[in-house]
Amino acid sequence: MSETGPSLQRPATRAARLSAIEQALATHIITSQSQLSKILIDEGIAVTQATLSRDLDEMHAVKTRLKDGTVAYTVGRSAVASEGEDVGERGEAQMSRVLNGLVTSVAAAGNLVVVHTPSGAAQYVASVIDRQPIEGVLGTIAGDDTVMVICTNDDTAVSRSDWLLSLASK
């Protein structure tokens, strides 16, 4: 195991490819399909230009001029950040709005973070967490009123627990 924890492995499926493209668009400023293709290859996903073009079209990805003049792919309003805007800060602001009204408690337990919500809200909270690329978080499992956030190690769970609590308290 590396110092940063286990790497995310994806099956060779269309859904996994679309998920990888979505994550790449959320975490990088992608200016060309060849740049996106290289990022996908680094993740072990080989894709033809034609398939990549169809995938981007299906995702409604469009090239948008950013504030600095760069033309990059974006998907909806939660896509690539413009110059001076950190994707992490924007993601935190979105998460804070959701978590503020829905999180009732947060606790770290081993490599897990346990997040309690009102009845029926856990699935929504988990999906908000899953949509953000959060370092050290592998994924979530949600029940009716509890979300388990699976982290790469115990220390990450403690730091992510504190972070989620601070977002919920804003």
UniProtKB/Swiss-Prot annotation:
GO terms for cellular component: cytoplasm. The gene is argR. It comes from the Bacteria. Regulates arginine biosynthesis genes. Its main location: cytoplasm. Pathway: Amino-acid biosynthesis; L-arginine biosynthesis [regulation]. One of its GO terms (molecular function) is arginine binding. InterPro entries: Arg_repress, Arg_repress_C, Arg_repress_C_sf, Arg_repress_DNA-bd, WH-like_DNA-bd_sf, WH_DNA-bd_sf. This is Arginine repressor. Keywords: Amino-acid biosynthesis, Arginine biosynthesis, Cytoplasm, DNA-binding, Repressor, Transcription, Transcription regulation. The lineage of its organism: Bacteria, Bacillati, Actinomycetota, Actinomycetes, Bifidobacteriales. It is found in: Cytoplasm. Belongs to the ArgR family. It comes from Bifidobacterium longum subsp. infantis (strain ATCC 15697 / DSM 20088 / JCM 1222 / NCTC 11817 / S12).
